[in-house]
């Protein structure tokens, strides 16, 4: 039991140290993408700089052009939207909601008092 525990703890500790060493090595090199090339961008450029340079080269075809087109769309309010909305007078069976059980109507099992007879 103790031998298994010690071997597990040794494995766990060594794995953590290895992971820590790997993350510190990548953090010390700077940008993770510094060694990669994206469509001819210089190594050391960030992905954002590379995309911006590519967009400028392709006559603004890309993310910025899509955002610009979305922002240039005109949205209009219809007359129906501007009309006064119906309101209730605050009672349980208000003006905008039909009466549930008018006076004199009997409540049956079938209706369950949800609608008038």
From Swiss-Prot:
InterPro entries: RALF, RALFL27
Propeptide: 28-71
An example Gene Ontology molecular-function term: hormone activity
Cellular component GO terms held in the UniProt record: apoplast
Glycosylation positions in this chain: 31
Pfam families referenced in this protein's UniProt entry, alphabetically: RALF
Annotated compartments: Secreted
Main location: secreted
One record GO biological process: regulation of growth
Keywords for the protein's UniProt record, in alphabetical order: Disulfide bond, Glycoprotein, Hormone, Secreted, Signal
S-S bridge residues: 88-96, 107-113
Signal sequence coordinates: 1-27
Functional description taken from the UniProt entry: Cell signaling peptide that may regulate plant stress, growth, and development. Mediates a rapid alkalinization of extracellular space by mediating a transient increase in the cytoplasmic Ca(2+) concentration leading to a calcium-dependent signaling events through a cell surface receptor and a concomitant activation of some intracellular mitogen-activated protein kinases.
Family, as annotated: Belongs to the plant rapid alkalinization factor (RALF) family.
Protein's UniProt name: Protein RALF-like 27
């Amino acid at each position: 039991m103790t031998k298994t525990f010690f071997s597990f703890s040794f494995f766990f500790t060594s794995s953590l140290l290895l992971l820590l060493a790997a993350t510190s090595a990548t953090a010390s090199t700077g940008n993770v993408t510094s060694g990669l090339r994206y469509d001819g961008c210089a190594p050391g450029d960030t992905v954002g700089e590379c995309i911006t340079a590519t967009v400028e080269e392709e006559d603004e075809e890309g993310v910025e052009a899509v955002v610009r087109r979305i922002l240039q769309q005109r949205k209009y309010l219809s007359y129906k939207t501007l009309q006064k909305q119906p309101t209730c007078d605050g009672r349980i069976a208000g003006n905008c909601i039909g009466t549930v059980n008018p006076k004199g109507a009997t409540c049956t099992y079938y209706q369950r008092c949800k609608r008038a007879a």
